[in-house]
């Protein structure tokens, strides 16, 4: 009979099989009330599942991350329960957990309106407030198929036919008269599922295949308590205010249009930000001793076949043909960089060779996934590839890590989560090579005092990698930076160098990206700063305004003087009230507004205001220029007097 070992090392002995709920009840009624599920020998199980042998057990509650996921998954079933009551002929497809919530794909003979979604959410609350028990039943494959066939649930039948082995025993979860199929676990009672909200609907093809029927996807969010739900909704509200698409339109940065889906039309101010970002990255490339190169954006398909991209990536590649040759528009820069490396004989003395490019890449992303600057088809990578020997890996990775943190800190990103992905089952190279490569990455992180977690088996077949995920002011995660070792591509493309022993050797290639996509990073920055870009990045840094026509000449003189000092400045000489001008440029998020009246003309000074409404008073013009130059040169995140 089972001996149950708890996380604190204590043991409980039973003379019969017990469930996690039984053990929780044995410990105390408070824990039993909080028990959502159990973790038995590392595996999540339902609170009702029996433990027949000795086991390690953790009780899962709403305070655990897994508990919250289970709540969200059960809310998806609750959605199914409600929609079948409101529209009984609905066919249910899949309802998984996603970040911060869940969704369910449904086949419904009507297009859901906002009023329908509100009615659906209301019914979900009515059902949840009944606090009914969720009943789990393990059945044979044939019984599960018969259950769903009798209910007309063709999508569930399809899942059973195509994805579940006949000797498997699927789990059925009964919500009163509603039944769903799932691996589980799920909440034992609906009292855990009171804090949710339906968010939106969208179209989604069955199994993600555009040849299949378009279903309706209903998104929701769910949390353990009301406070967490409200905090999340508040973050969403703030995120909506910061939406880069909205701000991009307000500030006239860029636009997208149907004739070029996923391609950016940069306007003058947006392109100014893009170019300033390039200048910043270039300064770091110089500091860290990179070459900058430029490869063609289109190359023969034969090259992509050699690299393996054609076999694994062709659906995401744009192609064209000319003179009976097929070309691929590059989705990435690495093959082109190997071609540059291959020009001329290389010696070990030439290594490491650090090659960077602002590479214009294109990927045929599904149209439904396109999202402003965050998900595009045409983008620019701040890409680099380092060719080095195995002995140089650690030092080069060290340099990449320092560069990542150097650049992210410039934008004020302080919370960065780092993950090290290790060897997958299918891989090339010897275990010794992988041992050394993984150790090199780990030691480089440790030497920089960077905490990290392992993602076991998540590396590419050609090498391990480090991923850098930054968190913004709303605590949203953005995976941007990568340092990826590659033991395959140089060999596939015949890259070599002459070693100290005069023998030809294949270099190791390190793929390195920091911002990732320039377009996406500008989207991230737009939302991080809510359009209040730091002065060095702002498209227009200063606007000089007159109060009456008598100051126009002085304004023009000052405008020229600031422009000559390298400051992006505009004059506003319109015949409008000064309050109107200030409001307008404040809404345009211009960092500094300089106001000229008769007093300023007489004194040769200038009145300085910030976009946050702070009046810095009258200042000497040369002093203003000097302070602005210092702020811009240092790429400060703060404005004068902050």
UniProtKB/Swiss-Prot annotation:
Entry-linked Gene3D superfamilies: 3.10.20.30, 3.30.54.20, Anticodon-binding domain (3.40.50.800), Bira Bifunctional Protein, Domain 2 (3.30.930.10), Threonyl-trna Synthetase, Chain A, domain 2 (3.30.980.10)
Cofactor descriptive note: Binds 1 zinc ion per subunit.
Record note on domains: The C-terminal domain recognizes the anticodon bases but the N-terminal also contributes to the precise recognition of tRNA(Thr) by ThrRS.
Functional summary from the UniProt entry: Catalyzes the attachment of threonine to tRNA(Thr) in a two-step reaction: L-threonine is first activated by ATP to form Thr-AMP and then transferred to the acceptor end of tRNA(Thr). Also edits incorrectly charged L-seryl-tRNA(Thr).
Stated family: Belongs to the class-II aminoacyl-tRNA synthetase family.
Residue ranges annotated for the TGS domain, each copy included: 1-61
Cell compartments where the protein resides: Cytoplasm
N6-acetyllysine: residues carrying this PTM: 286
Catalysed conversion reaction: tRNA(Thr) + L-threonine + ATP = L-threonyl-tRNA(Thr) + AMP + diphosphate + H(+)
Keyword Ligase annotated: yes
Name this protein carries in UniProt: Threonine--tRNA ligase
A GO MF term: ATP binding
PROSITE patterns to which the protein is assigned, alphabetical: AA_TRNA_LIGASE_II, TGS
Keyword hit for Protein biosynthesis: yes
Region (Catalytic): 243-534
Keywords: Acetylation, Aminoacyl-tRNA synthetase, ATP-binding, Cytoplasm, Ligase, Metal-binding, Nucleotide-binding, Protein biosynthesis, RNA-binding, tRNA-binding, Zinc
Positions contributing to Zn(2+) binding: 334, 385, 511
HAMAP family hit by this protein: Thr_tRNA_synth
GO biological process, any: threonyl-tRNA aminoacylation
EC number: 6.1.1.3
Organism of derivation: Escherichia coli O157:H7
Cofactor: Zn(2+)
Primary localization: cytoplasm
Quaternary structure note: Homodimer.
Name of the encoding gene: thrS
UniProt GO cellular component terms: cytosol
């Amino acid at each position: 009979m089972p001996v149950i070992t708890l996380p604190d090392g204590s043991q409980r002995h039973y003379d019969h099989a017990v469930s996690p709920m039984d053990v929780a009840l044995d410990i105390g009624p408070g824990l039993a009330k909080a028990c959502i599920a159990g973790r038995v020998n590392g595996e999540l199980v339902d609170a009702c599942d029996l433990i027949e042998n000795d086991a390690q057990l953790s009780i899962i509650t709403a305070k655990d991350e897994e508990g919250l996921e289970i709540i969200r998954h059960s809310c998806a079933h609750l959605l199914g329960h409600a929609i079948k009551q409101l529209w009984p002929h609905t066919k249910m497809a899949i309802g998984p957990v996603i970040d911060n919530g869940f969704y369910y794909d449904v086949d419904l003979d009507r297009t859901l309106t906002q009023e329908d979604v509100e009615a659906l959410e209301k019914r979900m609350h009515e059902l949840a407030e009944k606090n009914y028990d969720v009943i789990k039943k393990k059945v044979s494959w044939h019984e599960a198929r018969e259950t769903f066939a009798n209910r007309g649930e063709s999508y569930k039948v399809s899942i059973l036919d195509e994805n579940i082995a006949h000797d498997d025993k699927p789990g059925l979860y009964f919500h009163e008269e509603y039944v769903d199929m799932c691996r589980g676990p799920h909440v034992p009672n609906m009292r855990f599922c009171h804090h949710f909200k339906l968010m939106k609907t969208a179209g989604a093809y069955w199994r993600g295949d555009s040849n299949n029927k378009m279903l309706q996807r209903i998104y929701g969010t769910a949390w353990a308590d009301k406070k967490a739900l409200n905090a999340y909704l508040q973050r969403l509200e703030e995120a909506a205010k910061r939406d880069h698409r909205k701000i991009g339109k307000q500030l006239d940065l860029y636009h997208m249009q149907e004739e070029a889906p996923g391609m950016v039309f940069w306007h003058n101010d947006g392109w100014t930000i893009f170019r300033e970002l390039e200048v910043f990255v270039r300064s770091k490339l110089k500091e860290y001793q990179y070459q900058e190169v430029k490869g063609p954006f289109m190359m023969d398909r034969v090259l992509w076949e050699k690299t393996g991209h054609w076999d694994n990536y062709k659906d995401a590649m744009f192609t064209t043909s000319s003179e009976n040759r097929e070309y691929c528009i590059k989705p990435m820069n690495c093959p082109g960089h190997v071609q540059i490396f291959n020009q001329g004989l290389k010696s070990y003395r030439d290594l490491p060779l650090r090659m960077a490019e602002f590479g214009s890449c294109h990927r045929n992303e599904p149209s439904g996934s396109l999202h402003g600057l965050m998900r595009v088809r045409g983008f620019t990578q701040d890409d680099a590839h380092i060719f080095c020997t195995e002995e140089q890996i650690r030092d080069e990775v060290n340099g990449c890590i320092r560069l990542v943190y150097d650049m992210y800190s410039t934008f004020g990103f302080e919370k960065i989560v780092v993950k090290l992905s290790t060897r997958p089952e299918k891989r090339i190279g010897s275990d010794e090579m992988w041992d050394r490569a993984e150790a090199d990455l780990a030691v480089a992180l440790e030497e920089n005092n960077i905490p990290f977690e392992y993602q076991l088996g998540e590396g590419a077949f050609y090498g391990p990698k480090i991923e850098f995920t930054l968190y913004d002011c709303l605590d949203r995660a953005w995976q941007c930076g990568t340092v990826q070792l590659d033991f395959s591509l140089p060999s596939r493309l015949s890259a070599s160098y002459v070693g100290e022993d005069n023998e030809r050797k294949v270099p190791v290639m390190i793929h390195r990206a920091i911002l990732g996509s320039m377009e996406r990073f500008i989207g991230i920055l737009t939302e991080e700063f809510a359009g209040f870009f730091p002065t060095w990045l702002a498209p227009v840094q200063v606007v000089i305004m007159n109060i009456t026509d008598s100051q126009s000449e002085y304004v023009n003189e000052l405008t020229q003087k600031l422009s000559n000092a390298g400051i992006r400045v505009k004059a506003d000489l319109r015949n409008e009230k000064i309050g109107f001008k200030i409001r307008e440029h404040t809404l345009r998020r211009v960092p500094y507004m300089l106001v000229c009246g008769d007093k300023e003309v007489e004194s040769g000074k200038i009145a300085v205001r910030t976009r946050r409404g702070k009046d810095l008073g009258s200042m000497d013009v040369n002093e203003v220029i000097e302070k602005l130059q210092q702020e811009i040169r240092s790429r400060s995140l703060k404005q004068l007097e902050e």
